[in-house]
């Protein structure tokens, strides 16, 4: 054990991640501080492809979570926006301020702020309407009957709405929404990745620690169980990150990582079941006494 601990931290990490036997042999050589660092490093690796992919995005499909409101956009409403322009984050110009009402649905250009809203951003509502898209002087209001509603600032750019059609209006909304809420989405996604990684490691470490009570495997402490779980997740994390860098899909990345960790832990558990610890070292052989140690 002392000889293993004398090796550098990087070398121990690489050897521990290389194979199930390496995971078992080097699992006890890491301190809690090192275990925490490894956990954070591997979690960051999983976040890298998402961050890079998301930074390249210039618009987000708002219709995916506000379908009813976005489906109301039509060419008639697009014609109302003809001649308007965005300058320094403000809507100016234009000749028409008509509204299009259809039951509880509203499409309007409201330069006078006639329509009232209630609720906090994210759950915003326009009084009297279920679905609404309202262009005001400094921001866009979009609410959906599913309870979702946002106030979206116009991007700090110069843009002229010249002969817009339905697709153009949808593209503008998608672009403006992402420009304002990109940090929020990134934070939420990174939090999801962190929680999944933490839950997975905690369950695996706890499961291995519990098996100690039945003498199925030789685990000296919960720290060692946590270290083994984290080291076993290293190769799957690198593989998932590599796939994500080529073509990012959050679900695919998480599935590759989760399935890889499960397989690696299975092989590690099998290796531990075939070995026993004697004087701090892993040996093949019997289950209970020293006579079986090779």
Outline where the language-model segments fall.
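Internal alpha-helical transmembrane segments
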Residues: 1-69, 242
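General structural signal for secondary-structure boundaries
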Residues: 11, 27-32, 44, 146-155, ...
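Hydrophobic alpha-helical transmembrane segments
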Residues: 30-51, 117-128, 133, 181-197
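Long, solvent-exposed extracytoplasmic domains/loops
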Residues: 61-175
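Hydrophobic alpha-helical transmembrane segments and adjacent short intramembrane/lumenal linkers
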Residues: 166-281
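Short, highly charged, low-complexity non-transmembrane loops/tails of multi-pass membrane proteins
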Residues: 275-294
